[in-house]
Amino acid sequence: MSTGAQSKAVVAGQHADGPRLLADVGGTNARFALETGPGEITQIRVYPGADYPTITDAIRKYLKDVKISRVNHAAIAIANPVDGDQVTMTNHDWSFSIEATRRALGFDTLLVVNDFTALAMALPGLTDAQRVQVGGGARRQNSVIGLLGPGTGLGVSGLIPADDRWIALGSEGGHASFAPQDEREDLVLQYARKKFPHVSFERVCAGPGMEIIYRALAARDKKRVAATVDTVEIVERAHAGDALALETVECFCGILGAFAGSVALTLGALGGVYIGGGVALKLGELFTRSSFRARFEAKGRFTHYLENIPTYLITAEYPAFLGVSAILAEQLSNRSGGASSAVFERIRQMRDALTPAERRVADLALNHPRSIINDPIVDIARKADVSQPTVIRFCRSLGCQGLSDFKLKLATGLTGTIPMSHSQVHLGDTATDFGAKVLDNTVSAILQLREHLNFEHVENAIEILNGARRIEFYGLGNSNIVAQDAHYKFFRFGIPTIAYGDLYMQAASAALLGKGDVIVAVSKSGRAPELLRVLDVAMQAGAKVIAITSSNTPLAKRATVALETDHIEMRESQLSMISRILHLLMIDILAVGVAIRRASTNGELPEAVAQAKARASDDETADVLDWLSHGASPAAKDVARD
């Protein structure tokens, strides 16, 4: 069964790839809508979650009801933490794999995000008609925004401005421990402790928490309460003037106000704090006349700070759709034209230069990338209405070795269900959780590096190293580990090498370098002034510098060649973990490249290098390649055959 409700905004054009499915899945109901164009949300329907065994069944029922046979892109806001592929709902019995659900429904993209993360993304677009201010002054533009809301659970999120966009915070703040502020709330806590080993704000401040408060106050007054009383009935009684229900609502709103004030202080939410969820909205004037605002401001020395922060009650009917639509649009924009997916950008840039037949393959890749990834070449050719050789020519036009190589690169560009973002490790994570996050973050950074690494710069660096008279590796602090590793690899090539992790030794040695010498400088920040001065001295004497660092740093700008390794771990206060792995990988790439060059180069080399190369036979150089674990020497192959 579903309740039909439709909402349609002003038409702003149609999505070229067809309507997008939007969903807002709560503990009780699942709401679905179609977005046929930017801002055009229609066919909103609500389905009780208990009526459907799985989320896939609910989605199929909706698509059948609205007579839509094909959806390419979908996004779901769900009342649950989302961390990885498997989602198991806390307040409902649905459990599903995001990727398996995407495949089962035939979507190209399926995003699943926390519902309050989605709601947070809707806040900047709310109009005055979609919110009611409850106290406070004027919100500060381009400042942090707080969000919380009681529904089946207590959602908490925030919105942080970053240049011309917003970043939503994923949070489970509703599970913070409840802290009573008066004797009445002490009674509520004591009552709740009899039922729950840990009493969080969600236990007393979400929808079901109103029943806890009601029963606690009834026990205080020695009143008998029906076994079936629920939040809806309590709110109805309060509107009818029932004294116990009114006190329950007042206590509930006071606790919510105190919690909202804590959220505002924690986030520094000068852009305002918004209250979403269904409970506060149903309270109506009972909420606006309650002690919510007074308790929001009651923070002792910081009362004046909070007096100026406005609080808003969200009145928009389906605000989560606006937020999840914005998140999906940003992901698809990144895929087709953003910096996070180089392969899609390359297709767009080269499209006009392709033949008409190759353009059809390009359009298939842009609009239906999953089809390219999953289908065999015969099906790809059929869908694009081209020959199979045309598919191969298209892949090679993009610089790929063939279809398999193109599929791999295309898959890494799909951010819809492949984890390409940084997952935070939290206190209390199990070894399984934090171990998976550390590995996923590292893998994500490596895939990003592969997509964005300038291989022309890599070739130039290998050329410089292969012709070097002497190579010195400089790294300070944690980067010295990378420098030492590089020294151990490169000394096997017969080139004089050394690694220095001390500034005084670097300065003394750099003063002796000249033409034909190379320094490989490894630095996460690329800003150490002492290191930069040392490199300036060496470069003025004719030495070349290869920098392994972050983009747009002073080191990257000074170096002869810069190999840039950007990633999420960018704060100076952080110990280099991911950056160390990326820097070590860059050394591996350079070492393998030099090993291959020295095994195959027949051109002229500097005299000292030529003599060293003469002392190392091709077999010995191949042994070095095998030693680097990226090749197999003839001897190793013989052993394998034996």
Curated annotation (Swiss-Prot):
Quickly give the catalysed reaction: D-glucose + ATP = D-glucose 6-phosphate + ADP + H(+)
Q: What is its main location?
A: membrane
Asked whether the UniProt record includes Methyltransferase among its keywords, one would answer no
Q: What is one term from the GO cellular component aspect held by the record?
A: cytosol
Write down a Pfam family by its short name.
SIS
Q: Recorded GO terms, molecular function?
A: ATP binding; D-glucose binding; DNA binding; DNA-binding transcription factor activity; glucokinase activity
| Subcellular location, record wording | Membrane
Name of this chain's protein: Bifunctional protein glk
Q: To which species is this protein native?
A: Burkholderia orbicola (strain AU 1054)
